């Protein structure tokens, strides 16, 4: 082995050996070893090819097949679930529409019954008011007749008193009432 000799410009402690001591260059480029290198390359490639084709590729193919099968099953399940969800949504929308229609029918029936009830009450109230009005008018006519009868007597008494005071003698009651009746028919 060669003794390390320091060279100028190199750091201390580095060993420099000339290329002639290495044995002739980079081994893969030596022409004497090409045949052995090609043989080992073929053996390594063949072994690697055998391992890949018998071990790795079947495992990868199995994984891909399993993944594809799982995806297909998941897609089928999703399709079934979508179909079920669509039918459930359709049933929900139909039942909602039926419930809305039923609610509208109930509301209309309630409005109709309340309107009929209000109309019945209105007619009963109108009939009651008409009866009370007729009764009141009858009472007014009776009271008017009574009052008019009283007015007739009061007027006759007043006319008799006035005539008696003016002429000094009392007029005939029948004549005073007849005069009053004539004045009432004129108006």
Swiss-Prot record:
Primary location group: membrane
Membrane topology qualifier: Single-pass membrane protein
Keywords of the record: ATP synthesis, Cell inner membrane, Cell membrane, CF(0), Hydrogen ion transport, Ion transport, Membrane, Transmembrane, Transmembrane helix, Transport
Keyword Metal-binding: no
Pfam family, one: ATP-synt_B
Family: Belongs to the ATPase B chain family.
GO MF annotation: an example: proton-transporting ATP synthase activity, rotational mechanism
Subunit structure, as described in the record: F-type ATPases have 2 components, F(1) - the catalytic core - and F(0) - the membrane proton channel. F(1) has five subunits: alpha(3), beta(3), gamma(1), delta(1), epsilon(1). F(0) has three main subunits: a(1), b(2) and c(10-14). The alpha and beta chains form an alternating ring which encloses part of the gamma chain. F(1) is attached to F(0) by a central stalk formed by the gamma and epsilon chains, while a peripheral stalk is formed by the delta and b chains.
Record protein name field: ATP synthase subunit b 2
Localization per Swiss-Prot or TrEMBL: Cell inner membrane
GO cellular component: plasma membrane; proton-transporting ATP synthase complex
Ranges annotated as spanning the membrane: 32-52
Role according to the record: F(1)F(0) ATP synthase produces ATP from ADP in the presence of a proton or sodium gradient. F-type ATPases consist of two structural domains, F(1) containing the extramembraneous catalytic core and F(0) containing the membrane proton channel, linked together by a central stalk and a peripheral stalk. During catalysis, ATP synthesis in the catalytic domain of F(1) is coupled via a rotary mechanism of the central stalk subunits to proton translocation.
């Amino acid at each position: 082995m060669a003794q390390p000799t320091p060279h100028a410009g190199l750091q201390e402690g580095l060993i420099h050996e000339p290329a002639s001591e290495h044995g002739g260059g980079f081994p893969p480029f030596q022409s004497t070893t090409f045949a052995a290198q090609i043989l080992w390359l073929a053996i390594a490639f063949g072994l690697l090819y055998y391992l890949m084709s018998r071990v790795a590729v079947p495992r990868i193919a199995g994984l891909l097949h399993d993944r594809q099968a799982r995806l297909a099953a998941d897609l089928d399940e999703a399709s079934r679930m979508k179909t079920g969800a669509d039918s459930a949504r359709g049933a929900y929308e139909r039942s909602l529409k039926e419930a809305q229609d039923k609610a509208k029918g109930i509301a209309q029936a309630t409005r109709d019954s309340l309107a009929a009830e209000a109309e019945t009450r209105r007619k009963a109230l109108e009939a009651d008011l008409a009866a009370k009005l007729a009764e009141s008018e009858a009472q007014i006519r009776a009271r008017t007749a009574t009052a008019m009868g009283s007015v007739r007597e009061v007027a006759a008494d007043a006319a008799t008193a006035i005539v008696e005071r003016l002429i000094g003698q009392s007029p005939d009651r029948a004549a005073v009432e007849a005069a009053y009746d004539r004045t009432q028919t004129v108006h």
